[in-house]
Amino acid sequence: MSLVPATNYIYTPLNQLKGGTIVNVYGVVKFFKPPYLSKGTDYCSVVTIVDQTNVKLTCLLFSGNYEALPIIYKNGDIVRFHRLKIQVYKKETQGITSSGFASLTFEGTLGAPIIPRTSSKYFNFTTEDHKMVEALRVWASTHMSPSWTLLKLCDVQPMQYFDLTCQLLGKAEVDGASFLLKVWDGTRTPFPSWRVLIQDLVLEGDLSHIHRLQNLTIDILVYDNHVHVARSLKVGSFLRIYSLHTKLQSMNSENQTMLSLEFHLHGGTSYGRGIRVLPESNSDVDQLKKDLESANLTANQHSDVICQSEPDDSFPSSGSVSLYEVERCQQLSATILTDHQYLERTPLCAILKQKAPQQYRIRAKLRSYKPRRLFQSVKLHCPKCHLLQEVPHEGDLDIIFQDGATKTPDVKLQNTSLYDSKIWTTKNQKGRKVAVHFVKNNGILPLSNECLLLIEGGTLSEICKLSNKFNSVIPVRSGHEDLELLDLSAPFLIQGTIHHYGCKQCSSLRSIQNLNSLVDKTSWIPSSVAEALGIVPLQYVFVMTFTLDDGTGVLEAYLMDSDKFFQIPASEVLMDDDLQKSVDMIMDMFCPPGIKIDAYPWLECFIKSYNVTNGTDNQICYQIFDTTVAEDVI
């Protein structure tokens, strides 16, 4: 690597990013996934960064060359991205690679040497860059908590996810879907570590050295997409393994039951799961070498337990999850947590004994759910008064619009500075008059795909046809001095197949002329229209009851979510058969018909407890939050 002649680059703060631009940025790594092979031929890495503006940016980086992606070893590292393309996806700003994308990575520790990590032979690094790295280090030292997921073996506990810095002593192929790594970090686990039977396997490594270190060595099974990475590792190399999972397993011998601590790197890339080789120059490797040199090799560990890596599944005769069920090592959760991933799990039996309010992380299976007819789960929810109501049926809407169509439009309210008006007289319907008012943009009629219509006297079928041709439609009627909303029992805004409703209790309706404040906008955002008209908009939500079972207890939890849990908008599912099928498939996967519950997938969830008072009766209820369906399930 060598420096190139200095070029003056401009770096954009993360709070000033705009979609469609190509920028240069600096940031501190808050989350990352080590490079992994995508479904195509490229490698992919996901990196979330933050800077002094406290704005986060998630970047999806692709390259045909593994080494061309950022060389990140842990959260807190500092990155510099050149020629990063900014786009907006699902209302979230994100960065993606563009032509000529390049990156540098620096250790984020205060006082550490500022040495760029990059696979590029040539790069630009000036005194200004040096100052920016130092400034980010200082800021991060007071604004970001150090990652406590990086643990030593002596500190790990069962049912934990953590990152491990270690040295590879040996490796062996187990089968096509799993691979064995023997590693150490100079410390001993607090529980006996398991041993994978390898009598028929070829173990690569110094067997005498491994035997000498057996009291300090652990066996890790890695699965699925991580196998090809594990296979390429060199014995003796220093590794960081991300999101390693520990489980305490009971094994029955002749006269006693023994416990052993298992280590698994599950398939997939959730929570940054993966393996990275660390260079000898890395400061964490320096510390690891010191730990290895001072390790007490003669210390006696608890008796190691030898166990098979893949016991057969067994199903209990009862319809509840077996407390001692042997979970298959590769089995991943069908749901994932969107925050607080490293909180300890709590068994349901303990939750049921505690007072509310509390928050818990659980792992359970779905025994049953309501309603079984999933389209019935979509409701309308007011975020202000928390009222829940049914989504109006088409037949009810048709009656509301037919009733509105009996009133004749007032000629005095037509053709104003806000809109141009056109009147149609229907045939064979007693000369029913329909008024359509085309809202202008600064006095000019916009194109149909940008145009808002106000319609008087239209039927449901007529309004639906217009909503497919124009940007938005608002059903109105003639008032004494101005046009008014038809009725909050009907949608206040229709966009394509989406009907937007308002809360009758919380809304204080304003004149249609208040839309003047929005006429210079190029799109009609439902929340902006609602605000202009004094409407508190209702949200489409899925409302369901899940009966959860973890083998220690059974608990009913309430799900109320607009789009995060299923990653499918509740506002669209009623009008889209394909989306309805997707939700049906997800629920059939959670709760498969015709098989016993032990074969159901695990669900990883956050739930919160709260008190509900009904007269003199007090009840504790539970609600699911910060949980979403895993990407590989959708």
Swiss-Prot record:
Substitution effect: residue 259 to S: In PFBMFT8; uncertain significance; affects function in telomere maintenance in patient cells and when expressed in heterologous cells; decreased DNA binding; decreased localization to nucleus; no effect on interaction with ADC; no effect on localization to telomeres
MF terms (GO), sorted A to Z: 8-hydroxy-2'-deoxyguanosine DNA binding; DEAD/H-box RNA helicase binding; G-rich single-stranded DNA binding; G-rich strand telomeric DNA binding; single-stranded telomeric DNA binding; telomerase inhibitor activity; telomeric D-loop binding; telomeric DNA binding
Keyword tRNA processing (UniProt): no
One of the GO biological process terms: negative regulation of telomere maintenance via telomerase
Mutagenesis / variant outcome for changing residue 89 to C: In TPDS3; complete abolition of POT1-DNA complex formation, thus disrupting the interaction with telomeres and leading to elongated telomeres
Pfam families the UniProt entry points to: POT1, POT1_C_insert, POT1PC
Assembly: Homodimer or homooligomer. Component of the shelterin complex (telosome) composed of TERF1, TERF2, TINF2, TERF2IP, ACD and POT1. Binds single-stranded telomeric DNA as a monomer. Associated component of the telomerase holoenzyme complex. Found in a complex with TERF1, TINF2 and TNKS1. Interacts with TNKS1. Forms heterodimers with ACD. Identified in a complex with ACD and single-stranded telomeric DNA.
Described purpose of this protein according to its UniProt entry: Component of the telomerase ribonucleoprotein (RNP) complex that is essential for the replication of chromosome termini. Is a component of the double-stranded telomeric DNA-binding TRF1 complex which is involved in the regulation of telomere length by cis-inhibition of telomerase. Also acts as a single-stranded telomeric DNA-binding protein and thus may act as a downstream effector of the TRF1 complex and may transduce information about telomere maintenance and/or length to the telomere terminus.
Disease implication from the record: Tumor predisposition syndrome 3: An autosomal dominant disorder characterized by an increased risk for the development of various types of benign and malignant neoplasms throughout life, with age-dependent penetrance. Affected individuals can develop neoplasms involving epithelial, mesenchymal, and neuronal tissues, as well as lymphoid and myeloid cancers. The disorder is associated with elongated telomeres. Cerebroretinal microangiopathy with calcifications and cysts 3: An autosomal recessive disorder characterized by intrauterine growth retardation, retinal exudates, global developmental delay, neurologic regression, intracranial calcifications, and leukoencephalopathy.
UniProt similarity note: Belongs to the telombin family.
Entry protein name: Protection of telomeres protein 1
